[in-house]
Amino acid sequence: MTSKIKCALIGSGNIGTDLLYKLMRSDVLEPVWMVGIDPESDGLARAKAAGLKVTADGINGLLPFVEADEIKIAFDATSAYVHAENSRKLNELGVVMIDLTPAAIGPFCVPPVNLSQLDENVKNINMVTCGGQATIPMVAAVSRVQAVEYGEIVATVSSRSVGPGTRQNIDEFTRTTAGAVEQIGGAEKGKAIIVINPAEPPLLMRDTIHCLTKEQPDEQAITASVHEMIEQVQQYVPGYTLKNGPVFDGRKVTIFLEVEGLGDYLPKYAGNLDIMTAAAARTAEMLASKMLNPEPHYNVTQEAALA
């Protein structure tokens, strides 16, 4: 049996708990700790039942055990407000931090766009936001064909899928996503909007992407690029679907997406959780494979090889 890299999950809410199930299926990652602040949280209860060590004392409850339990990677699914301190404390112990908050201390990672370009020595990687993971691949699909003057994304998510941490970070969500639309998506100017939909029954995550190209768009090349990128995202988020588009109106290119989750923790309508946690797991698998096989040529998964 192949050895695995041991991991800790910080945050026992929706994102942390959904991520737990994905890590439990990994060939190269082994979740051994879950950290929370509410001893009654469902996430901690599920983690304990799955055999993980748990603490409700926050990050300080984990620190004394990091070295003994050989934790090499930690996932922070708490809040942008506390991430900097969490990252500092764990980085000092040699742990690489995968940041699922909008804190954006480390470089952005959107797997099909820039996973292969990440610095292998980086100690903090930011997964942007759920809206960013869903939409930035589409902005990048357009910008790799021709220059994008302006990119705007609208992410609509079910209210039931949005926990208190995300609600506290709405401003950070929009700023971080807009920044990544520019830095990773390739738009000269980016804007992000999140809509929390209270509809019952809950709707699937839906995303609209608008790109304004500098020149008249090459419709055939952009359409081919978008379909190619859709296939790359589907390799780790099977429910990532192009519902309409690309639609061309002058220099404006519009793409409509729907994201259905795997239903690991919350039901399938929570595609926003799925795309975030799947992207984080995929990024960590790349890091873990490098740790386990430090050769120049590593093999993470078939999906990563095709990305």
UniProtKB/Swiss-Prot annotation:
It catalyses: acetaldehyde + NAD(+) + CoA = acetyl-CoA + NADH + H(+). Its EC number is 1.2.1.10. GO terms for biological process: catabolic process. It comes from the Bacteria. The keyword Transferase does not apply. One of its GO terms (molecular function) is NAD binding. It is an enzyme of class 1 (oxidoreductase). NAD(+) binds at residues 12-15, 161-169, 272. The active site is at 130 (acyl-thioester intermediate). It holds the Pfam family AcetDehyd-dimer. Keywords: Aromatic hydrocarbons catabolism, NAD, Oxidoreductase. NCBIfam families: ac_ald_DH_ac, PRK08300.1. HAMAP family: Ac_ald_DH_ac (MF_01657). Belongs to the acetaldehyde dehydrogenase family. This is Acetaldehyde dehydrogenase.
